[in-house]
Amino acid sequence: MDDAVLARIDIKKRKFLDVKADSAAMRRAKKEAYFQYIYHTVGIEGNTLSLAQTRAILETRLAVVGKSIMEHNEILGMEAALKYINNTLIDKYGDISIQDILEIHRRVIGNVDPVEAGLFRRTQVPNATSPVLYLQ
């Protein structure tokens, strides 16, 4: 990066830090980032719901016609995990434990795969959006 790019980044950072944490603009930005985070996180594993559909599920708790229950549950599980993190771990003193991670995992996939939720995997699971590469 050259100095001009770094200077622009610094200006934007200062403008961002000037926004009051309790302002309407900051609340809207946080809410939008929340929806986008959930949308992109479940999308990595192949969820086909759009950002607008994801937002609608989270805001209304109503199902989207033509989409699977599993896709809905992935979104609701991710939301449950984020609520758990924000309500219990955000102010936790000390390291996050293996048990904390398993509790997050239990919430993320609890409605999708309740048998495996909160446990270590015993099998390899390939990423839905990437081809499997084998060593020759």
What spans do the regions from the language model cover?
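FIC/Doc superfamily catalytic core
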Residues: 1-136
